Amino acid sequence: MTKNLLVELGLEELPAYVVTPSEKQLGEKMAAFLKENRLSFEAIQTFSTPRRLAVRVTGLSDKQSDLTEDFKGPAKKIALDSDGNFTKAAQGFVRGKGLTVEDIEFREIKGEEYVYVTKEEVGQSVEAIVPGVVDVLKSLTFPVSMHWAGNSFEYIRPVHTLTVLLDEQEFDLDFLDIKGSRVSRGHRFLGKETKIQSALSYEEDLRKQFVIADPCEREQMIVDQIKEIEAKHGVHIEIDADLLNEVLNLVEYPTAFMGSFDAKYLEVPEEVLVTSMKEHQRYFVVRDQDGKLLPNFISVRNGNAERLKNVIKGNEKVLVARLEDGEFFWREDQKLVISDLVEKLNNVTFHEKIGSLREHMIRTGQITVLLAEKAGLSVDETVDLARAAAIYKFDLLTGMVGEFDELQGIMGEKYTLLAGETPAVAAAIREHYMPTSAEGELPESKVGAVLAIADKLDTILSFFSVGLIPSGSNDPYALRRATQGVVRILDAFGWHIAMDELIDSLYALKFDSLTYENKAEVMDFIKARVDKMMGSTPKDIKEAVLAGSNFVVADMLEAASALVEVSKEEDFKPSVESLSRAFNLAEKAEGVATVDSALFENDQEKALAEAVETLVLSGPASQQLKQLFALSPVIDAFFENTMVMAEDQAVRQNRLAILSQLTKKAAKFACFNQINTK
């Protein structure tokens, strides 16, 4: 016979961004708890609102499965003394298992007998296991936590109720000074406290109190209501996935409505209006069927449709205040002079240990000069890049960005166009922030891409130079994101810029305000981001490519893909093993590896030396790999007919030199001795 278990934790309002991850975590930890306690079940469903986290297990076994375990003890010769009596070693072993020497049996393993005992544990009833769910709740982790009411413990928010039901059976468990009961709280304004009748009646019991416990149902309600408004007014409403997820975690009983604002505000840049609505007010944007922004918005109320007109007026009033600010800053910022703002950046701190934003811009400008040549920019592009690098942070001192910091770069583009700068300069100022997330949009223009790389590289090197290096999950200056951005941009544009050579060049630059250090740490940090970009590539292949001598990002990623592609083919294992053997022996070469043909003693070493001399890796990675694998028979013949570590030192070093030259060329693809062929 199966049962159904419900666990609900009632809390103060949770931050919206915490709700969904916490709900997921609760479900995963409940499943692990049941598995650990040998309780089978059919399904787990989780629930969440801003004021509760809950999980329901259906088809739950009414008792644990029985457990039978075998334990291996000491060898028989240790377990028995000369008289055949059990020794203290044997007695201590069985006592530790809660058994006696009468339970001992001997089993033979590889010709020797050992003590074995079998322990059987009869499964307990599910009722005896249910109290353990409190430990599941205690084990939940959160990005922030708090103390309350003078308590020593802490949690994401103060706890108000705990409901644990096994079908209709109530468990009065204790959790953080809260006594469990079947009482749950309804909607803060529309509902009241209610008793949950059973695990299966949970959603309906709360629905009567204006709480939609299932987030999927709440989400569908919001979407359906928005679609209804769309159809009624003939408009298009942008349902942003992130905004939708945030809004559904702000309400327990959603009601969507449309408000409006004066069309005069449409003269302000669209990005300002959208930011005001989406980021600050959590409103959905409304457009006409051609995509043109309309003076309307969609909001979602935490409640029903009663007195909705008053709610609409209140939301419109709040939004207008925001739009007034935007209109004011748009008008006033156009009176500012870009060069004046750039000069004032001398007084804005980039970081107290590093210097001002203006100094950061100057260093970035010097880096762009180096990158422009390596990226093959045209004369016009180089001119635009120099101008963009000279002014690209100016908009940080505008009123608009001061009020709406999400618009940095975006407003810089608009203000530079108004000031008569070229579209390329304006676009680069917007694009230099890209990507803003791990999978974020990349710059489209070469000028913007180079400026983005330069800005990020100076940021990375500057923070490393003063010892502000990310450790563990701690990365307060988002240096991992910046490095990932550099790697992604280089890959996307296919620029053959070797990162090790680039970093060497940057360290050679002499900046008055800062001297770069920690070069090795920077290189390891960049390699870690390339490793991440390789995704699910096997670890040994990643290590082989990262250990190679070619540090062009696009080449490294292509090499890893090529190795994965051929790893299942028949010639992969023998070819890699041949190259791997060459790599291992080449490490023994001393000094500069030069080959003297006069020291050859057989045709096989001559053949390998000639093959290595003519080897020029070219074309796509798959072609280069074929070139290397084609050497496998020549390498094998060399090893079969040649004693590499010959007694004659000159002959030995000559043979090692052949292998050293081979591996030097092969290492431009990967260090093959890092690949596991077993």
Swiss-Prot record:
Its main location: cytoplasm. It is found in: Cytoplasm. This is Glycine--tRNA ligase beta subunit. One of its GO terms (molecular function) is arginine-tRNA ligase activity. Its EC number is 6.1.1.14. Tetramer of two alpha and two beta subunits. Pfam families: DALR_1, tRNA_synt_2f. It comes from the Bacteria. It is an enzyme of class 6 (ligase). One of its GO terms (biological process) is arginyl-tRNA aminoacylation. The keyword Nuclease does not apply. One of its GO terms (cellular component) is cytosol. Keywords: Aminoacyl-tRNA synthetase, ATP-binding, Cytoplasm, Ligase, Nucleotide-binding, Protein biosynthesis. InterPro entries: DALR_anticod-bd, Gly-tRNA-synth_bsu, Gly-tRNA-synth_heterodimer. Belongs to the class-II aminoacyl-tRNA synthetase family.
